Amino acid sequence: VCGDSYISTAHVLWLEDSGLEVIPIPYDTDRFEWYFNQINGLYLPSGGAFASTQKSYYNCCKTFLQLAVAANNAGNYFPVWGGCMGMQQMMIIADGRDDIENFLETFDSMHNLCLPLIFTDKGLKSKLMKNAYESDPSFLINLMTTDVSLNNHSMGVSREKFTRSKLLNRTYDIISYNYDRNGKQSGSH
């Protein structure tokens, strides 16, 4: 939360239940290489440290993403997962302009808006969703027909803005999207 460094217990338990060991990294660290060499994946959580108000958090995310891209480009698999605000950080960084004050837009998705996922064609063909469908078709159908996606954020990236950003489009594909209470479309995060 702006000015503090914490990880929600729910996030830690979720990661540990998946068999992962959690190593917290302070967002104000200057030991990026040291931490990077201690981990084999990166999770950028949701929370309250927005890029426009917490530059040190943004710079930490940017440095670790650059290290992850370099590792992957060198053939060393290094996964990165961004949840909600973490995904927002990843999109701002991938856009390449560091426009942390203006890149995100407001959405009316606060206060536990639960929705089904609307998959794009690329999303349905993605490795993540294709494998899920092949192992359990009812799982994917459930994601598309049941209110399973918790939307509890006021900021995001519209599908239109995502489409206009050439660098962002080269880096990521929208797998699914949702509409907020006012009908504004954003990529699911």
Where do the model's predicted regions map?
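N-terminal beta1-alpha1 cap of cysteine-dependent amidohydrolase-like domains
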Residues: 1-188
